[in-house]
UniProtKB/Swiss-Prot annotation:
The gene is leuS. InterPro entries: Leu-tRNA-ligase (IPR002302), Leu_tRNA-synth_edit (IPR025709), M/V/L/I-tRNA-synth_anticd-bd (IPR013155), Methionyl/Leucyl_tRNA_Synth (IPR015413), Rossmann-like_a/b/a_fold (IPR014729), tRNAsynth_Ia_anticodon-bd (IPR009080), Val/Leu/Ile-tRNA-synth_edit (IPR009008). Its EC number is 6.1.1.4. Its main location: cytoplasm. This is Leucine--tRNA ligase. It catalyses: tRNA(Leu) + L-leucine + ATP = L-leucyl-tRNA(Leu) + AMP + diphosphate. It is found in: Cytoplasm.
Length: 945
């Protein structure tokens, strides 16, 4: 037996052995120490430094890891962590080898901005924040394998982030094979003649630099002079996903401008089809799948060629059936052809609405581009007022030869299709609005609408379309595409909204690129032996930011200041030469794109993850999950806000690693679960400034801060809203197990719920009742007996076991808690002098996933030397799950009038007889015979008068 803790200095009014917050704190500290000392939650690997005996039944549970904020956790943060801990603990008790740990997503803008504000190096603040967060998480009793934790800022971790970057850089996407291959294989095909150059040149005739340029054009990581989102206020470029709907930065809320810059890009678009198609095999919320499908935006249509002033405008349309209804062509203002085809002067008689008041088309274009520079893509698509200018040029419709005026307009984007549209105002709302604004023709080509009022976008018969007349829309699409292909003026094709991933940031706090440049500016990937490229320690790590509204500013990365680090002498095969390091850093998504794999093999110095360990933890298991199982982490829990950022990026990286043979799973996460959020009230004064929520008083339905009335709003919990509640505060006042039970009892895990500190005491009272089932509050003695339990208790026990097991498996911890409360109440009422051990111990075991410290303490007091962390979890006996009796509601003419309880195996005739003999029914019938009696076995009795 182990020594049991006692509460220090209990008050006279409180029984000496009551389960108080003070006693809970002592119990929790003691068991946390023991778990850590004994490695209770250490999960063995098949091979390597963490090798051990591994059972076939395994479970890999993962949380979306946190950013180590300087403010620490509030009670909303642990919601998902506690839920996964309950899930992991339950399955560990079922005999599974459970891998559950937690790392820290520590690179990126937030840490750097916080460091700049405080004047402390980001590594110093980040490491201090991690220490504090680890302390907070440990206090919650999370059963993590502490050997597997890391931060993305650890050199041993980002060594492998850089290594994966090099593998992607050294790969290309073979469209015929539908997968990534090594760039050396592509070069071998060029050398052998198995693959020809697109321009017809012979490979052997190319210079070394020309060959490198060809290979670079195929790589999955490439340099591009691309249109990017430039944020002067942050001093960096941003991915599309990091820009808000109103054209501002997600971090800092600064204006974002579109401009051309030379940047590293990742060719995620090569995987568009697989990223869409493989969603079918994932056990993910349909909402997230839909978000990814919409973000990738795959659409079938036709690419049509319009001749314009000696140039060819390629237009992608999903509605080639409406080609005869095109009355103008519109280009995105940034389209590469705009400057080539803009006319020198306005055509005679041009409509003044088309010119923007400019003297020449070129002046109109320049002024228009300037006017829309600060608009986000979403603003440009949704803004009600349609704007644009005429280029003074006409394009020829390939199906009827009509001359169509060519405009630029901000509602056309370069990021989708070809950046050019054929405008069909009769059957597209935005085109209709533009045509109405500019006095352009509107032609009906699909019957069924009233074009004097609005565009018609419904189905119908094709009209005013020559050889298509009388066809359905579907038949017309097929026929026009065949005609375009036959004439050489178009072809059927597929387009995507997804753009390649902008993979560089002009910041300090991120992973350095394993890339150097020679004197001519050519990029060279470093050999693996040069990894890791460590982030240099610099005194001035602040970003070079600019006037937030200065769209003409240019990036100036902080790493460029580290001259001694930037300039380096290396021998890359041509003798010792001076090179210049890349001074950008990777985006904050880099580490999270593969971290699940490092959890598997966190201390391996030779590879990022041993193949045998990866196969064990994340390899496909078709015998369990079906023939199309992609493999991956068994359960991944986190917020839905990462649907098109982290989750899309991680799928892309993982698929490349799969194609190159480094992993056996084709997807990183087999099952995804999105938890809801804990929300809270916040309060603002007359100025709209938030005031501390804990200083607000309620009087007669109104709310006051320091005597002044304030407004109440409901939403997220956070420091800026001044409504945060620290888990430390709740643990101190009630204990960690109480916090765990309260958060899991608040409602279904996938819904948001309001925090109410005053309600936490309810969870504490439940745990106190569970404590009293085992321990006498006055003496501290055990209250259990060796008596045989009553049959109704055995029924209650086995019903609880079956229900709680089902709930834990399905992440329904709120209903599991309700069943445990019900069973605890049964034991309390049925056995005031002490319950039988045989029905108490299963309660303690069932309680363990939710309230592990309390359960361990009670299990120990019941005489067990070993921890219950590895079970066994109780198993229900089927014979006790069959009910002896059934309650039947009795309806009379459709309304429930009474209820009767009968034997579960009672025949229909007896049920009818008992129902008709019920006092309330006898009174209602008043001596009359019912017209009909319907007995639904096990459900109800319906009487028709």
């Amino acid at each position: 037996m182990t020594e049991h803790v006692q509460p220090a200095n209990p008050s006279d009014a409180t029984p000496q052995h009551r389960y108080t917050a003070e006693l809970a704190g002592q119990i929790e500290q003691r068991w946390q120490d023991r778990w850590s000392e004994e490695g209770t939650f250490n999960a063995p690997n098949p091979v390597g430094p963490l090798a051990g005996d591994v059972p076939a039944d395994k479970l890999f549970v993962q949380d979306m890891f946190p950013y180590p904020s300087g403010t620490g956790l509030h009670v909303g943060h642990p919601l998902g962590y506690i839920a996964t801990d309950v899930f992991a603990r339950y399955h560990r008790m079922q005999g599974h080898n459970v891998l559950h740990t937690l790392g820290y997503d520590a690179f990126g803008l937030p840490a750097e901005q916080y460091a700049v504000q405080t004047g402390t190096h980001p590594r110093t603040t980040t490491e201090a924040n991690i220490v504090n967060m680890k302390r907070q998480l440990r206090r919650l009793g999370l059963g993590h394998d502490e050997r597997r934790t890391f931060a993305t800022t650890d050199t041993d971790f980002y060594h492998w982030t850089q290594w994966i970057f090099l593998q992607i850089h050294d790969a290309w996407f073979d469209k015929e094979a539908g997968k990534a291959r090594r760039i050396s294989e592509l070069e071998a095909e060029f050398v052998s003649g198995a693959r020809s150059l697109e321009d017809g040149r012979e490979w052997a005739s190319l210079s070394v630099s020309e060959k490198e340029a060809v290979l670079d054009s195929y790589r999955l990581v490439y340099h591009s002079d691309s249109m990017v989102n430039w944020c002067p206020g942050l001093g960096t470029v941003l991915a599309n996903e990091e820009v808000t709907a109103d054209g501002r930065s997600d971090r800092g809320n600064f204006p974002v401008f579109r401009k051309h810059l030379q940047q590293w890009m990742m060719r995620i678009t090569a995987y568009s089809d697989r990223l869409v198609d493989d969603l079918e095999y994932l056990d993910w919320p349909e909402k997230v799948k839909t978000m990814q499908r919409n973000w990738i935006g795959r659409s079938h249509g036709a690419q049509v060629k319009f001749q314009a002033d000696g140039h060819e405008i390629e237009v992608f349309t999903t509605r080639p059936d409406t080609l005869f209804g095109a009355t103008y062509v519109t280009l995105a203002p940034e389209h590469e052809l705009v400057d080539d085809i803009v006319a020198a002067e306005w055509p005679r008689g041009v409509d003044s609405r088309w010119t923007g008041g400019a003297a020449t088309p070129a002046e109109a274009v320049a002024a228009y581009r300037k006017s829309i520079a600060a608009k986000s893509d979403l603003e440009r698509q949704e803004y009600k007022e349609k704007t644009g200018v005429f280029l003074g040029t006409y394009a020829v419709n390939p199906v009827n030869g009509h001359k169509l005026p060519v405009f630029i307009a901000d509602y056309v984007l370069t990021g989708y299709g070809t950046g050019a549209i054929m405008a069909v105002p009769g059957h597209d709302h935005r085109d209709y609005e533009f045509a109405t604004e500019f006095g352009l023709d509107i032609v009906e080509v699909i019957s069924g609408g009233d074009l004097t009022k609005d565009a018609y976008t419904g189905d119908g018969t094709i009209v005013n379309s020559d050889f298509l007349n009388g066809m359905s829309v579907a038949d017309a699409k097929k026929a026009i595409t065949e005609r375009l292909e036959a004439d050489g003026t178009g072809k059927g094709t597929i387009q995507y909204k997804l753009r390649d991933w902008l993979f560089a940031r002009q910041r300090y706090w991120g992973e350095p690129f394993p890339i150097v440049y020679d004197a001519e500016g050519n990029a060279h990937a470093l050999p693996e032996s040069s990894l890791p490229v460590e982030l240099p320690e610099v005194e001035d790590y602040a970003p070079v930011s600019f006037d937030p509204d200065d769209a003409s500013s240019e990036p100036s990365p902080p790493l460029a200041k580290a001259v001694d680090w930037v300039n380096v002498e290396l021998d890359l095969g041509d003798g010792l030469q001076t090179y210049r390091r890349d001074t950008n850093v990777m985006p904050q998504w880099a580490g999270s794109s593969w971290y699940q794999l490092r959890y598997i093999d966190p201390t391996n110095p030779d590879v990022f993850c041993d193949k045998e360990n990866e196969r064990y933890w994340t390899g496909p298991r078709p015998e369990i999950h079906g023939p199309n199982d992609p493999g991956g982490v068994d359960l991944y829990v986190g917020g839905v806000e990462h649907a098109v950022l982290h989750l899309l990026y991680s799928r892309f990286w993982h698929k490349v690693l799969f194609d190159l043979g480094y992993v056996s799973s084709s997807e990183p996460y087999r099952r995804l679960y999105n938890q809801g959020y804990i929300q809270a009230y916040a309060y603002t004064d007359a100025r709209g400034v938030y005031v501390p929520a804990d200083e607000v008083e309620e009087k007669d339905g109104k709310f006051f801060h320091q005597g002044v009335e304030v407004n109440r709003e409901y939403g997220k919990m956070g420091k800026s809203l001044k409504n945060s509640v620290s888990p430390d505060e709740i643990c101190e006042e009630y204990g960690a197990d109480t916090l765990r039970v309260y958060e899991m009892s608040m409602g279904p895990l996938d819904t948001s719920r309001p925090w109410a500190t005053k309600d936490v005491v309810g969870a504490q009272r439940f745990l106190q009742r569970a404590w009293r089932v085992v321990v006498d509050e006055e003496s501290g003695a055990l209250r259990v007996t060796d008596d045989a339990p009553a049959e109704d208790t055995l029924r209650a026990l086995n019903k609880a076991i079956a229900g709680v097991s089902e709930d834990y498996t399905a992440l329904r911890d709120n209903t599991a808690a309700a069943k445990l409360i019900e069973y605890t109440n049964h034991l309390t009422k049925a056995y005031p002098g002490g319950a039988p051990r045989s029905v108490v111990e299963p309660l303690v075991l069932m309680l363990a996933p939710l309230a592990p410290h309390l359960a361990e303490e009670l299990w120990s007091r019941l005489g067990h030397e070993k921890s219950l962390a590895h079970g066994p979890f109780p198993v229900a006996e089927e014979k006790w799950l069959v009910e002896d009796t059934v309650e039947y509601p009795i309806q009379v003419n459709g309304k429930v009038r009474s209820r009767v309880t009968v034997a579960a195996d009672a025949p229909r005739e007896e049920i009818e007889k008992i129902a008709l003999a019920d006092d309330k029914i006898v009174a209602l019938l008043d001596g009359q015979d019912p017209r009909k009696v319907i007995v639904v076995p096990g459900k109800m009795v319906n009487i028709v008068r």
